[in-house]
């Protein structure tokens, strides 16, 4: 059975990480710093998925910035399908970042948890790092999500 190929630029184990916190706690700023650092360090592709068009001037041109509203992504299943499509279409992806995941998933925490669970498997198969911000109190998150902070 074909399970995909890992990025030829990925030299170490993949990382799946969440940045969780209340609104205004600096999650997006942290994500922007990580996107720009990854884009500067990698020879592969870095993708940043966002809700709306707010990060245009903050994210380096070396990273591909994708607005979910332009593609009609309004649910957890749509977000996962989009990420899977990115991974399937570009085998040089080393990092995928998602900002405002809870907003993209229409504030469905169970849906966000489902995306995290499925992307962990996808990340191992295709060999990319994954970082996502979630605007919620950490107490509202599952144990699986807390373990990825």
Located regions from the model:
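Conserved P-loop
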Residues: 12-87, 141-144
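Short, Lys/Arg-enriched N-terminal segments with co-localized hydrophobic residues
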Residues: 1-14
